[in-house]
């Protein structure tokens, strides 16, 4: 591998493992970005459903379970909706934490790899 100053840097097994690990982390980072976007949309949908439920004046409402709508008492639907909101918020928080952890690991690997290979390696996204 050719460095900017004209000397060759040998890629050791450990270097290759770090490069591979960076690639896996980068892939997971992009997956998490998509999952976070979907989780935020789900949170918004649950919030909208809660708002619609507040406006509803019926004692029995239709509640979607999988692909089927079931008629359920309003109180049960409110309780289920609140539980779903809590679960969705926890999931979003967990995904955000994992994303931050991955970013920290990627930053550490960048420091190591750029320290050794300088301009001969590009870990930035275009």
UniProtKB/Swiss-Prot annotation:
Keywords noted in UniProt: Chaperone
One GO-annotated biological process of the protein: response to cold
Source organism superkingdom: Eukaryota
InterPro entries: PFD_beta-like, PFDN4, Prefoldin
Keyword Transferase found: no
UniProt GO MF annotations: unfolded protein binding
Pfam families assigned: Prefoldin_2
Gene Ontology cellular-component terms listed: cytoplasm; prefoldin complex
Family indicated by similarity: Belongs to the prefoldin subunit beta family.
PANTHER family in the record: PREFOLDIN SUBUNIT 4 (PTHR21100:SF9)
Physiological role: Binds specifically to cytosolic chaperonin (c-CPN) and transfers target proteins to it. Binds to nascent polypeptide chain and promotes folding in an environment in which there are many competing pathways for nonnative proteins.
Summary of subunit composition and partner proteins: Heterohexamer of two PFD-alpha type and four PFD-beta type subunits.
Name this protein carries in UniProt: Probable prefoldin subunit 4
Organism per entry: Avena fatua
């Amino acid at each position: 591998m050719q460095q900017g100053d004209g000397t060759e840097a040998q890629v050791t097994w450990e270097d290759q493992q770090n490069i591979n690990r960076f690639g896996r982390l980068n892939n997971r980072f992009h997956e998490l970005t998509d999952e976070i976007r979907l989780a935020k949309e789900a949170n918004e949908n649950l919030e909208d459903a809660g708002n619609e439920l507040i406006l509803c004046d019926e004692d029995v409402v239709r509640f979607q379970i999988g692909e089927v709508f079931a008629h359920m008492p309003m109180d049960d639907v409110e309780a289920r909706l609140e539980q779903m909101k809590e679960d969705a918020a926890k999931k979003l928080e967990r995904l955000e934490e994992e994303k931050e952890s991955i970013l920290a690991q990627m930053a550490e690997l960048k420091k190591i790899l750029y320290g050794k290979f300088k301009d001969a390696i590009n870990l930035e996204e275009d």
